[in-house]
């Protein structure tokens, strides 16, 4: 336990102190709870504990806390958890729920801080309003672009053409982008048949890498269309959601409820990465009558920030009579064995997963050595040397392509299976091979990961790149949403070395070969969604490094985030 935690626990009292000392609550949880209770004149320690666990839930990705199940979920049976009925009664009676409320209860069990209550309520209301704001229109001939053999995609397009908000979900290789490109051609045809102007279309994704992949995939599919369809669509580009909404440092987005987006059709890819807060900003900026198409894989990891919006939308819309979810299930892209592995993970079949990992298939490798370092070195060092060779030649296209040949993915940043440890280890191995000091901060061939948005440079959190040698010194080339960006290394502030990266950061990208470094089986981050996300980053080969116990632990554990959005969407109202 950190010294600061112990010091703060001395100042805390009652239940909050006990939970802080047990490691369930950290300093920030306790501080917020004490501050809010003091301002409201709330003296009941059960309410203080409720506030603290609500703040804790946000750190874990939930937008609220379920007071009826938190004791079981938190896994500390030895702590003095309040009786659930008494706990809820104390919260209901708290001045923190008075007007103006600091806390809210939904379904008499889910406790929210005010901001997230309002955002969830707003997302529900805005999406349902968009759902019903489009007037019925004629549907073009779907079989023209979705002939026999494209039945799932044709049904998805039919759904999207008939409603204002569409959730299009499916795993990798199921044809989501193919469906989107051809759907957009039909949307343009639909407008033409109705005598309307050509629709203004926006393509967006949460990260620059995801936006670049979306743009590339849509362009590739558009090239297969006839000249009339291509002319209807015009030249489509993809941007990050932050750029679409007009992000301004230290201020709200430029596009909001008072200044709506001008587009008739907005497509968002990798929606599983979108937090509740970002979805609230997007939904309020979409003008009435526009068509919103949310694309993603609901079985992947949810956003780094609070919320599991895509999964909630799938579950919430699925039971409504006025909203259909477009689901694609048949994979066309993967080598059969990787797709089968991903499906076994998604289904939670641990025996099938381990059977595939040990099958000896060329596209799948399982490394369960007690010390995997020698086998990892044989993979990581040759890749790093190929990257260095391209970088020394200043060959930006070759370097970026080489970068995407392989990724080492970790669940954690810290610890023996974490990103920081393996970045240092690969740099040390490189130093042995090249003689370059491992502490050199900038060097040709250094793989880069952007960790914060820089709107001036147009580089965004999650973008990747490489440091290149040039006639005037080192430069960085970043794989941005609109193509490669050449940037002076001195202008890049928030970047880190990317010989390894977290699985969360890998979302929105795919590479030829992936090595997944599993943490110990007791890791809190180890979930089915984590392993599924990691495996589905691979196009050609996946290598899983870890024990059988860690694989089984991942398969058995689901990433569950508390939220009321699903229930709100299923009910008659959002409040």
Swiss-Prot record:
Keyword ATP-binding: yes
Catalyses which reaction(s): Couples ATP hydrolysis with the unwinding of duplex DNA at the replication fork by translocating in the 5'-3' direction. This creates two antiparallel DNA single strands (ssDNA). The leading ssDNA polymer is the template for DNA polymerase III holoenzyme which synthesizes a continuous strand; ATP + H2O = ADP + phosphate + H(+)
Binding-site list for ATP: 170-177
InterPro entries, sorted: Coronavir_polyprotein_1ab, P-loop_NTPase, RecD, RecD_N, RecD_N_sf, UvrD-like_helicase_C
A GO-annotated cellular component: cytosol
Cross-referenced Gene3D superfamilies: P-loop containing nucleotide triphosphate hydrolases, RecBCD complex, subunit RecD, N-terminal domain
Keyword Hydrolase among UniProt keywords: yes
GO molecular function: 5'-3' DNA helicase activity; ATP binding; ATP hydrolysis activity; DNA binding; exodeoxyribonuclease V activity; single-stranded DNA helicase activity
UniProt entry keywords in alphabetical sequence: ATP-binding, DNA damage, DNA repair, DNA-binding, Exonuclease, Helicase, Hydrolase, Isomerase, Nuclease, Nucleotide-binding
EC number: 5.6.2.3
Biological process, per Gene Ontology: DNA recombination; double-strand break repair via homologous recombination
Effect of disrupting the coding gene: Not essential for growth.
Enzyme's top EC category: isomerase
Leftover remarks: In the RecBCD complex, RecB has a slow 3'-5' helicase, an exonuclease activity and loads RecA onto ssDNA, RecD has a fast 5'-3' helicase activity, while RecC stimulates the ATPase and processivity of the RecB helicase and contributes to recognition of the Chi site.
Described purpose of this protein according to its UniProt entry: A helicase/nuclease that prepares dsDNA breaks (DSB) for recombinational DNA repair. Binds to DSBs and unwinds DNA via a highly rapid and processive ATP-dependent bidirectional helicase activity. Holoenzyme degrades any linearized DNA that is unable to undergo homologous recombination. In the holoenzyme this subunit has ssDNA-dependent ATPase and 5'-3' helicase activity. When added to pre-assembled RecBC greatly stimulates nuclease activity and augments holoenzyme processivity.
Record-stated family: Belongs to the RecD family.
Record's protein name: RecBCD enzyme subunit RecD
Organism: Mycobacterium tuberculosis (strain ATCC 25618 / H37Rv)
């Amino acid at each position: 336990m950190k010294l600061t935690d112990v010091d703060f626990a001395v100042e805390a009292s009652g239940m909050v102190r006990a939970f802080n000392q047990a490691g369930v609550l950290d300093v920030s949880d306790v501080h917020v709870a004490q501050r809010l209770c003091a301002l409201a004149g709330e003296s009941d320690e059960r309410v203080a504990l409720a506030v603290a666990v609500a703040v804790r839930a946000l750190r874990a990705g939930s937008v609220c806390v379920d007071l009826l199940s938190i004791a079981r979920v938190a896994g500390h049976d030895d702590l003095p958890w309040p009786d659930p009925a008494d706990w809820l009664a104390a919260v209901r009676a708290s001045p923190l729920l008075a007007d103006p409320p600091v806390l809210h209860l939904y379904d008499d069990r889910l406790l929210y801080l005010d901001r997230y209550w309002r955002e969830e309520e707003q997302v529900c209301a805005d999406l349902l309003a968009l759902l019903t704001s489009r007037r019925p229109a004629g549907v073009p001939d779907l079989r023209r672009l979705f002939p026999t053999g494209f039945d799932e995609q044709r049904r998805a397009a039919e759904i999207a053409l008939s409603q204002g908000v569409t959730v299009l979900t499916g795993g990798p290789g199921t044809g989501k982008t193919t469906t989107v490109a051809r759907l957009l051609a039909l949307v343009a045809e639909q407008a033409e048949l109705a005598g309307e102007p050509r629709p203004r279309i926006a393509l967006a994704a949460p990260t620059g890498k995801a936006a670049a992949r979306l743009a590339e995939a849509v362009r590739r599919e558009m090239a297969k269309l006839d000249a009339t369809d291509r002319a209807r669509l015009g030249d489509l580009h993809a941007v990050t959601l932050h750029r679409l909404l007009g992000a301004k440092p230290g201020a709200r987005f430029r596009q909001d409820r008072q200044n709506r987006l001008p587009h008739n059709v907005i497509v968002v890819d990798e929606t599983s990465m979108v937090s509740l807060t970002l979805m609230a900003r997007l939904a309020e900026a979409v003008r009435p009558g526009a068509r919103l198409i949310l694309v993603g894989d609901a079985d992947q990891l949810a956003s780094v920030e609070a919320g599991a919006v895509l999964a909630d939308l799938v579950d919430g819309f699925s039971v409504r009579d006025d909203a259909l979810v477009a689901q694609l299930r048949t994979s066309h892209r993967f080598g059969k064995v990787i797709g089968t592995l991903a499906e076994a993970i998604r289904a939670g079949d641990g025996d099938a997963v381990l059977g595939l990992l040990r099958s000896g298939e060329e596209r799948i490798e399982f490394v369960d050595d007690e010390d995997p370092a020698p086998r990892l070195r044989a993979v990581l060092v040759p890749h790093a040397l190929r990257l260095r060779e391209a970088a020394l030649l200043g060959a930006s296209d070759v370097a970026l392509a080489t970068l995407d040949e392989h990724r080492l993915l970790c669940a954690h940043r810290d610890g023996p299976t974490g990103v920081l440890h393996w970045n240092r280890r690969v740099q040390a191995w490189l130093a042995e091979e090249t003689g370059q000091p491992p502490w050199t901060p900038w060097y040709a061939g250094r793989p880069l990961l952007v960790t914060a948005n820089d709107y001036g440079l147009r580089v965004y959190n999650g973008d990747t790149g490489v440091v290149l040698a040039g006639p005037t010194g080192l430069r960085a080339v970043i794989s941005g949403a609109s193509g490669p960006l050449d940037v002076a290394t001195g202008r890049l502030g928030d970047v880190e070395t990317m010989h390894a990266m977290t699985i969360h950061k890998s979302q929105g990208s795919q590479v030829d070969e992936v090595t997944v470094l599993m943490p110990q089986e007791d890791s809190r981050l180890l979930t089915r969604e984590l392993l599924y996300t990691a495996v589905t980053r691979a196009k050609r080969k996946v290598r899983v490094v870890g024990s059988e116990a860690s694989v089984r632990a991942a398969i058995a554990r689901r990433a569950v985030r508390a939220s009321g959005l699903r229930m709100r969407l299923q009910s008659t109202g959002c409040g």
